Amino acid sequence: MDEMAILIDVSKCTACRSCQVACKNWNQLKAEKTTNRGSHENPPDLSSSTWNRIRFHEAIKDGRIDLLFINERCRHCAEPPCVAAAEDVPGAIIKDPAGPVVITEKAKQLNAQDIRDACPFDIPRFDETGQIFKCTMCADRVLNGLKPACVQACSTGALSFGPKPAMLALAEKSM
């Protein structure tokens, strides 16, 4: 299988959050109790039960509020710093040739904060037991020829999925 990638085109994102819901549903992640903080943004951050979220940036421009959206999730780096940070426990975090960066059961032997600190995007999260969580790119779906749940759910075309060279070409074309 070719290396696969997700392309995020923020210019097409309407912040409907269907990607968040699809991720929670597919991965059977529990709902989080949140409070209204005066923003449309919810939940407030990634967590052990929120692996994908839309972050809102509110900017005032010409007297009006512009909402800018950023999809926060694991970037499934070409050379993942989290994999390098986990080298003391071989196989704890792997970069699958198909694209996903996957955390295995062996990761329980790692210091979760060290793994989070290694990520330049501050993505991995951990629970009270120290177990590490992050977007898996729906590796179980991808390895069976399906799109990640978030991409399948995106009705605006903000999320695209395919072979990495095709996604890079699509990104270049849209710039």
Description of each model-found segment:
Residues M1-M175:
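Non-ligating segments of multi-cofactor redox enzymes
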